[in-house]
């Protein structure tokens, strides 16, 4: 039967190895590597401006983004589905008040936020689904350790452009964690030069019977707020101006304008605040691995050290000259 000291040493070795392994896998359980959480709640982003305009008439304007996490999803990637609607007033149940509606579906890298393939875009218009190359993150930015989130400029996807636009770091606010704010400004852009859509152009006729083609033009100035530990979008503040212009870019007709910010930003931020940062996760990993290694070394020393009682019995058993 093994002596108790050997048994204890073997247990220490096992415990030490277990702690080292736990240290290696801890970041995945702590989400401290900046991955997109899969159990997010409160993922509806609603912006409402009671002083907006639609086709030149003053009216309330609501934009709503609803994000859903779907399968397939694993440690490396996640599937996202985002509904983006724009409507008059604050009740989206009335179809007649709908200005536009679209649904985006794509697969995303959980760490970097980068799309892994083209997005599938469906709209309420009588058009087949389109495939759009996103070419940049939207609802999640990379965090420190993958790519520096605090870069002065990042390319963030804009669904109205169907392309990325530069977003410049505007600040970092410490309110129950750190929220990074990026400013994204879109200069007046003729959307017909970006993609085909039913309302991107229109024909008008003047009093003399002359026809002219107008082009839907888009301008925006928005602030995007991202929680720093996860890189997840927690809030939006934007001024959006959509209008029709002639070939020279001169404004001729208003379409939609609004200035609003999302509700519930603090709740989204609070839900993410308990997730450890990457530095905290690394600290936990290092401490657990070091403690495990020390315990394993102590156990090995005890296991390999000669047993005193066995050595003494052998010494007594040896014949004397």
Spans of features found by a protein language model:
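Hydrophobic secretory-pathway targeting helix
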Residues: 1-40
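Juxtamembrane interface at the cytosolic side of transmembrane helices
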Residues: 2-7, 276-321
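Membrane interfacial helix motifs at helix-loop boundaries and amphipathic/re-entrant anchors
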Residues: 30-39, 262-288
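Hydrophobic alpha-helical segments that drive targeting, anchoring, or assembly
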Residues: 79-89, 99-106, 119, 123-124, ...
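A cross-kingdom signal targeting lumenal/periplasmic-facing segments of multi-pass membrane
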Residues: 90-170
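Extended, hydrophilic extramembrane loops/domains of integral membrane proteins
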Residues: 226-272
């Amino acid at each position: 039967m093994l002596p108790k000291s050997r048994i204890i040493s073997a247990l220490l070795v096992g415990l030490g190895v277990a702690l080292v392994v736990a240290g290696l896998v801890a970041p995945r359980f702590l989400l401290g590597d900046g991955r997109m959480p899969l159990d997010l709640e409160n993922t509806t982003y609603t912006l409402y401006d009671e002083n907006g305009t639609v086709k030149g008439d003053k009216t309330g304007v609501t934009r709503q983004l609803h994000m859903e996490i779907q399968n397939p999803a694993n440690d490396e990637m996640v599937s996202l589905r985002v509904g983006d609607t724009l409507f008059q007033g604050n009740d989206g149940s009335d179809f007649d008040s709908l200005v536009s509606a679209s649904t985006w579906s794509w697969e995303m890298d959980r760490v970097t936020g980068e799309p892994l393939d083209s997005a599938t875009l469906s709209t309420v218009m009588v058009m087949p689904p389109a495939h759009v190359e996103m070419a940049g993150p939207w609802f999640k930015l990379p965090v420190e350790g993958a790519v520096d989130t605090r870069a002065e400029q990042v390319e963030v996807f804009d669904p109205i452009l169907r392309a990325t636009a530069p977003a410049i770091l505007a600040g970092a606010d410490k309110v129950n964690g750190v929220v990074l704010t990026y400013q994204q400004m879109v200069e007046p852009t003729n959307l017909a030069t970006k993609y085909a859509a039913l309302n991107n152009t229109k024909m008008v006729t003047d009093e003399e019977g002359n026809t002219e083609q107008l082009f839907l033009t888009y301008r925006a100035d928005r602030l995007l707020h991202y929680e720093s530990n996860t890189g997840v979008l927690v809030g939006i503040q934007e001024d959006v101006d959509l209008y029709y212009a002639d070939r020279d870019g001169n404004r001729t007709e208003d379409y939609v304008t609004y200035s609003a910010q999302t509700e519930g930003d603090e709740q989204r931020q609070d839900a993410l605040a308990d997730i450890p940062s990457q530095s905290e996760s690394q600290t936990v990993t290092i401490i657990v691995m070091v403690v495990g290694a020390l315990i394993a070394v102590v156990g090995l020393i005890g296991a390999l050290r000669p047993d005193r009682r066995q050595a003494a019995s052998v010494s007594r058993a040896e014949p004397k000259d």
